[in-house]
Amino acid sequence: MEIFNQIYILCSGLISGVIIFQSLIVASSIFTVLPEENAGILLRNLFPKFFLFLIFLSSLSLTFSFLANLNFYPFGFIGILGLLSMSVCYFIIPKTNQARDEKDDSLFKKLHTLSVSLTLLVLFLNLAVIFLIS
């Protein structure tokens, strides 16, 4: 059971690290290095993979929370929230891109804000695991 516990913690750390790396380093660097047109093309390629990877890690996290026999609340709940939140982010990508292409700034801003908010929620919940598990 201890190995499952360690893998659960590792998954939470990976989720947090991937979000921080993608948000603070990759996305911000792309906008400073590439022209806006090319940055958009690259980000449209990266973000679906980013969300799919987080869905995968959240699924692992949820699985290992059960295998480690951790309390559903908060540990399994964090996995479910991660899985659902990142799925929403993934599935709104086409509408977000369409809003950007059609210059529907209001809809784009709402969808982008939803995506960022859900990603931050998942980040904070997974960072909290370190404090909750000890």
Describe each PLM feature range:
Residues 1-134:
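Polytopic transmembrane helical bundles with strong interfacial aromatic enrichment
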